[in-house]
Each structure stands twice: as structure tokens, then as C-alpha cells.
Amino acid sequence: MSSNDQQRGGVADKALQLVMEMKRNPDVLPPYNADLVRQCQKKIDELFHKNAAVVERMRNGLEHDPSLLQPRLAAMCHIRRCMMAYVNERKNRIRSFRWRYGGALPASVRNALCEAEIQFFNEYSSTLARFQSNLGEAGVNLLLHTAPPKTLFVQVRTLEDYGEFETSDGTQVQLTKDSLHSLPRQDCEMLIRQGVLELVH
């Protein structure tokens, strides 16, 4: 195998690592791999400029061997497809977090996002909030009742000191760590998603 083939193969393997990173972690979002993404971007630029230089020499009659043009183009397309698959899968998972946790991401999730992904999450949250507020006279919370309730009230345990919480009927509840409560399902669904409460079975 030539050194050029090894070089292209090495970068293609690195691009594939991005895809495999997501495949190996189907239930969690791994930290954004900025270093590997930059390496892939750099290699695409490098291959593009090499091809552009060959084309320019061919136009000037200085180059008569176009044999490396197609392999470089194939390598660029492969790297780009892997990067797009990586970004798209992360985007889909980030959107699902909005439905799972509401507008407040757990620190473990937020720390795995890059700045652009945090901005995307915030913009998606704002768009969803505007859409919900425009439904009906008082708006609709689409994050509630995502599954048919078996009972109107549920037993929950508080996982952290949260403080005072007001239910939809105006009842004040003090949520302290390890305390048990019977609350309306619709009032505590968001706190369950955020990890403040857990269902007691």
C-alpha cells in the first residue's frame, strides 16, 4: 500500500470513529469530539487543495496524471458523510432531551455539548415554547401527558432539596431530600424528568 493510500485510509478511519462513537453509546450522549472533527475538516481542506492544484496544472499542460483526483474526491465524500452522520445523530438526541428534561438540561448532558449545540438546544426550546403558547387561549404544554395516566395521583420520592413547590390546585408542598409525597401526575412530570423526583412503585 502506498503512503498516499495509508494517509487517506487513516483519516477515513478517524472519520468513521465519529460514527462508531455514537453507535457505541446509544443511551447517552458522549462529549463532542472537537479534536477529531477538526482533524477531519483539516483533511478535507488538504485533499481539496491538492486536487485543485492538480486541476490547475492540467489546465496549464503541466500535469498529465489525474489518477489521484478520484480517490481524493472519494475520501473527501466519505469523511464528509461521516461528519454529517455524527452531527445529525447528536442533533436528534439533543432534540429528544428537550422532550425528556424540559428546558433545564442536567449538568451531565450540558457538559457533553459544544457551544453550538447549546445554542441549538436553546433555540429549539424557544421555538417549542412559542409554538405551545400559541395553541388555544392559554397555550398547551406538549411535554405533559406523553403517555396515558393510570392514576391522577402518583407516589414520588424527592431526590434532592428542592424547596417549596406549588401544585396546580394551589397546594404548597415542601420538597426535601428523601421525602415522600402523593402529587398530581401532571404537576410532577417535569420534576421527574429533571431528576428532582422519582416514582415510587
UniProtKB/Swiss-Prot annotation:
Q: Name one GO cellular component term.
A: GINS complex
**Which branch of life, at top level?**
Eukaryota
List this protein's GO terms for biological process. Answer: DNA strand elongation involved in mitotic DNA replication
| Gene3D superfamilies the UniProt entry points to | 1.20.58.1030
Keyword terms, alphabetized: DNA replication, Nucleus
Record-linked Pfam families: PSF1_C (PF24997), Sld5 (PF05916)
- InterPro entries recorded: GINS_A (IPR021151), GINS_bundle-like_dom_sf (IPR036224), GINS_Psf1 (IPR005339), PSF1_C (IPR056783)
* Compartments where found: Nucleus
Keyword Nucleus part of the UniProt annotation: yes
User: Quaternary structure per UniProt?
Assistant: Component of the GINS complex which is a heterotetramer of gins1, gins2, gins3 and gins4.
Report the function annotation for this chain: The GINS complex plays an essential role in the initiation of DNA replication.
The entry's family comment says: Belongs to the GINS1/PSF1 family.
Return the protein name. Answer: Probable DNA replication complex GINS protein PSF1
User: What is the organism of origin for this protein?
Assistant: Caenorhabditis briggsae
Taxonomy of origin reads:
Eukaryota, Metazoa, Ecdysozoa, Nematoda, Chromadorea
Q: Which gene encodes it?
A: psf-1
